[in-house]
């Protein structure tokens, strides 16, 4: 990942996060999420977007936030082998970051389960956590979601 990125900045709970715009397919408002019983804790369901079945991830659940209310916006991102919809409260802006406004994520904030917390940036004097969206799912989680999505396509 180069130092200069244009992130799509969004709010989840009280925090701001960003994802490289090159990985974002679209931003959708109020999609109809169909709940899937017995799915992974942070998969809130699936959505049929222009004929394509896409799993929906609750970032509040993934990040263990107390506020579990549903967001009004969905950011569709392209992972290496699939697409996933990220439930967010609000899309703030498409930012433009200079290299001197980006720092590595402090080591104290990173664990084996938070490898996706990539870097931190300052946009308009606000801290934005930049997500490495390719690491948001473990290989095992990604495989489970891929298999589930394939099953849904075949039904």
Where are these regions (language model features)?
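An acidic, low-aromatic, low-complexity terminal/linker signal
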Residues: 1-155
């Amino acid at each position: 990942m180069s130092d200069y990125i244009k992130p799509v900045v969004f709010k989840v709970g009280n925090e701001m996060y960003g994802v490289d715009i090159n990985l974002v397919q679209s931003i959708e408002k109020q999609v109809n999420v169909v709940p899937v019983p017995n799915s992974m804790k942070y998969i809130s369901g699936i959505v049929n977007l222009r004929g394509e079945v896409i799993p929906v991830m609750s970032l509040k659940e993934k990040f263990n936030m107390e506020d579990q209310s549903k967001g009004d916006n969905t950011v569709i991102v392209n992972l290496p082998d699939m697409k996933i919809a990220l439930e967010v409260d609000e899309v703030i802006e498409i930012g433009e970051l200079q290299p001197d406004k980006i720092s590595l994520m402090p080591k104290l904030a990173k664990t084996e389960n938070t490898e996706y917390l990539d870097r931190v940036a300052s946009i308009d004097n606000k801290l934005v956590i930049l997500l490495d969206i390719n690491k948001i799912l473990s290989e095992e989680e990604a495989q489970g979601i891929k298999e589930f999505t394939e099953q849904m396509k075949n039904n």
